[in-house]
Amino acid sequence: FINFFDGFRTSHEIQKIEIWDYEDLKPLVDMDAVKAFRKNALNPDAPVTRGTAENPDVYFQHREASNKFYLNVPDVVEHYMNEVNKLAGTNYQLFNYHGAPDATDVVVTMGSSAQVVESTVDYLNKLGRKVGFINVHLFRPFATDRLLKALPKTVERIAVLDRTKEPGALAEPLFLDVQAAVVDGGRNVKVIAGRYGLSSKDVIPADIVAVFDNLAADNGKKFFTLGINDDVTFLSLDRAEGVEVETPGLTECKFWGFGSDGTVGANKSAIKIIGDHTDMYAQAYF
């Protein structure tokens, strides 16, 4: 498995996190299996020669023989997500749905955009709009049955947000998987594709409202971008106006300063004091 983060964002951020106690983690880990795995590692103390080539008469068969292991991965991940949920009181699923139970318009995304989409969905639900979003927690292997199970039966339109660009391809990976899953499941649903966040370009609630507006429009863009002004291929969506997404108990501050005037240092000290000496959650981005 690969867990990946935005390197620039995480290197310019201070955030308060909750840490698990190792005693709580122990029941989730089969240490005998870990030891057996490590014994197979290549190292000078246990040298071994392994086949460096495989003839074409058997290579294809061996590649296909591994299918069952990949097919079992969703069940294994789901099992351990449920174990984590029991210990931490969380609700991790392979595909988490959030929003109106009878939503007609849904955004599917994963990673850094998930929280802003969730807060925007709550904002639009309060305004009476039947919208929702699906947060993808397991991208590979892609569990089509779990996605279709998470998707409300009332959904008519889906917007998929990818944080990557695949020049020359028909579209980006998550969009292609979601579209194939919807077709495979026999669902008559419109699916469109958006790109966001390249080089940490910000996406705000006004962008997500624009996604839902574009999704519901009769002449909306099938392929679009967020957070930029594309005056070359004209794929970008204009940010919606008048969007005020409020989170109860949240205080936000923005500071301006000149280089070396101490603004960054003072804010780093302040956010660390708040995080270390209060029960409040604290986050800072520089």
Task: Give residue ranges: language-model regions.
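Conserved anion/nucleotide-ligand pocket segment
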Residues: 1-19, 246-259, 265
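Conformationally flexible catalytic loops at phosphate/diphosphate-handling active centers
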Residues: 2-96
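Glycine-rich beta-alpha junction loops
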Residues: 5-12, 111-113, 164-165, 195-200, ...
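Short acidic, glycine/serine/threonine-rich loops at helix termini
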Residues: 12-19, 118-120, 144-146, 169-173, ...
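Glycine-/acidic-rich phosphate or pyrophosphate-binding loops and their flanking alpha/beta elements
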Residues: 82-105, 118, 236-252
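Anionic-ligand anchoring segments at beta-strand to alpha-helix junctions in alpha/beta enzyme folds, i.e.
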Residues: 87, 101, 106-137, 251-286
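Glycine-rich, anion-gripping cofactor-binding loops and their flanking helix/strand elements
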Residues: 104-106, 114, 118, 123-126, ...
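Peripheral docking tails and interdomain loops at the edges
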Residues: 157-246
